[in-house]
């Protein structure tokens, strides 16, 4: 197929003359104002060239499809993409036309202007903007009156029942906040002055002041107070007024609550769900959105349909971009560099029900055919970006996904739009929409946190989802799809892309197929992990948008729920100033009694400990007693909590006032129980997924309540609540331990509470029940001398039931979590054991569980640990050895069974020094948490590898990736690891020697740390002791290059 570049003469493939133009081509503008900067790789007309051709062009931007030019402005005007009525999809056929097609005429509206019909529609996102009445003269007065002179409009984005994209503009939702009034006249006077100053700054807005009686959520109170309620038609002006009043030291309440949150909370609406709409007004012209159907209504016209949980068939799109660096060394591209251009963009379009998939590729220059892919050729990067954005606008995806798109693809597209002065927000669901990216602070736990906003579209980055949901050695796309899908990416390296792209049409097709395949894989991950269902369940429960679920964390979820609950009780939430520096002690860990236990150890676990503490002790902002109210309450009305720091917090009991947090938790837990019951009897596969995600959302939200109160920089922190929760948790652990140690060593008592133990054989010399460890919400109970294991295990539920009934107020409950048949308890947070009924080991905090340990060390250490539990000879030997004194070791020697364990280590050393260990088993890794130059400590092995890759002009890893490296042989045995770190692929290719001494030392260290309790107490350096037990042998020194 010939490709004609209308801006540069071609002596290559194709004609010098343009294809026959359509009638729409007659409209040309060549004014300087309409000219755009055309950047074109010279390779598309002169193969293998690395130059860029630049000139200003006054022609209309266009793309080429099937050799025919298509003007982009005509596509946008008629909302018609050139691909339509295409049956062929991925070399197969589908019923109907390509789902990219939008009709070129106005959609058949289900209603007419001002008629009495009802529209049923589903929403997934809300957009908020301010409007001026002079711009909406065409609207009926019932809507326009809310815009005088300016007003807030909430646009609900979704679909009607027949699948039509809809934007419902809701009028009449005011923004408001409260001001505490000590002196009403003085307060009103101060407000008037603030508003007068704002008017001078041209902030036109109507507002109303009225006195209301409310109670603050913060602190127990029995009397209402007078507050000034400030109601604004324009929320931007309202927020500015609140800030000015705060600066004047007025106490402000709820000024950070957004209008769409007010809309949802005040009217008990739903952020993700179905609505019915009475008497809508249909916008035929002057639309604010790019949706097919746009309606206007008042708040009172809407009715939420809470019983409906099904989804309309939303449109989705996975995309990926490929870039070309303009630097001589093909360095990693940077959007701010004018010569680092986007060369290809792939889009895979599919519906939420996953019934159809179409594949599209936008490319610079001509491209050979790729089976099943629609190819759109562009002559310049400007036209490539415009074509892609036009495609997004015409297709109108509701969900956009990709892999690392938040940190790279979307910011890169936005950066190039900024370079060309393209208003990318106009291509969103809203005509005055936003397409922005904010890069937040980087940290180890929140790598490269980028918040992306595309008005009316949900952004789900599968890289972030996989980071949270998938445990993998690294989270590169190739690794994740191999684990989850059993598939591989196309084998095109970063360095091959420029070479292939510059070569010819076929080379660009190889790069294009690679680009499209990445989007296909992301589509499959999207449908595999189903995070959109989980996010929608959380959004629905918390009354926030899905995008807030994705980007804003747990704080906004709990705050919105609390706002709704407080409103029902007539309480208002104070706006918190910058939090103080006070801290509190976190969860308790009981000091472990380390050792190897060749006897059952039961783990008793508190069910939902922190939520149940909040419920049991009525902890809340509104039940917290301040000094002013202590004297007016009786002792029996108060729960006192004393912390380890000596601070005392007091809360009223439920009969005085019920905790709002407790009510929320009780409601959520009851709902979760009901949902799980429904799930047991559900037969529909999709409904099973929805119910499962709903119960998971309820669980996650319950567990987030405690954290919400304890984050000092959060939306509404309360140190007293967070500190009281952990203090009560410590008390519960201590009481449980004391009760078990005091009462459970009486065999008669045990048979009374657990009839299963009657007539059970017991070794009176060995009988002992003790708590050997406690961690946050669980206790480890040693059970010695009870010889019938089956009876013992069947008695455990009675043990915890008795403890719960005797010690704890409801709903605090102790449960049997698991039972270890053998346990190696190393220290706090570190143990390994064999669970009853299972053969595999259960570990926590052991070196071989961590990802920065190589496979050789991990597997050998695991083999040694397994031998402790599977080989009785070794088990008995190490148990005996752990209790030996120095004199006993000198006289008797070490138990023979211990040397069976040593033999495993000796064999591993032989394989290592004889080069029988695969290099991939020797890989170490670390996460690149930030750019190399931002590290305070530069002498780190993984940074050495990144720098070496840069020097060799290899593909550079992204922030958040795990960097793999191996340690090379070196004449100095004490050389630092960062000096000898190297990329494993490079080592394998060049057959470099491995530093066997380093790896064997790491092995010895890992094993000693993992089994340290088996060594006698008099041994101060177990690693040296273990090394001395391994027979010595001399190996040839490596030949260094």
From Swiss-Prot:
Subcellular location(s) of the protein: Host nucleus
Database matches in InterPro entries: DNA-dir_DNA_pol_B (IPR006172), DNA-dir_DNA_pol_B_CS (IPR017964), DNA-dir_DNA_pol_B_exonuc (IPR006133), DNA-dir_DNA_pol_B_multi_dom (IPR006134), DNA/RNA_pol_sf (IPR043502), DNA_pol_B_thumb (IPR042087), DNA_pol_palm_dom_sf (IPR023211), DNA_pol_type-B (IPR050240)
MF-aspect GO terms: DNA binding; DNA-directed DNA polymerase activity; nucleotide binding; RNA-DNA hybrid ribonuclease activity
Highest taxon of the lineage: Viruses
Biological process, per Gene Ontology: DNA-templated DNA replication; viral DNA genome replication
Pfam families assigned to the protein according to its UniProt record, in alphabetical order: DNA_pol_B (PF00136), DNA_pol_B_exo1 (PF03104)
Catalytic activity as recorded in UniProt: DNA(n) + a 2'-deoxyribonucleoside 5'-triphosphate = DNA(n+1) + diphosphate; Endonucleolytic cleavage to 5'-phosphomonoester
PROSITE patterns: DNA_POLYMERASE_B (PS00116)
EC number: 2.7.7.7, 3.1.26.4
Keywords recorded for this protein, A-Z: DNA replication, DNA-binding, DNA-directed DNA polymerase, Endonuclease, Host nucleus, Hydrolase, Multifunctional enzyme, Nuclease, Nucleotidyltransferase, Transferase, Viral DNA replication
Residue ranges, annotated region (Disordered): 1-23
Gene Ontology cellular-component annotations: host cell nucleus
Summary of the function given for this chain in its UniProt record: Replicates viral genomic DNA. The replication complex is composed of six viral proteins: the DNA polymerase, processivity factor, primase, primase-associated factor, helicase, and ssDNA-binding protein. Additionally, the polymerase contains an intrinsic ribonuclease H (RNase H) activity that specifically degrades RNA/DNA heteroduplexes or duplex DNA substrates in the 5' to 3' direction. Therefore, it can catalyze the excision of the RNA primers that initiate the synthesis of Okazaki fragments at a replication fork during viral DNA replication.
Family named by the database record: Belongs to the DNA polymerase type-B family.
PANTHER family: DNA POLYMERASE CATALYTIC SUBUNIT, DNA POLYMERASE DELTA CATALYTIC SUBUNIT
Protein name listed in UniProt: DNA polymerase catalytic subunit
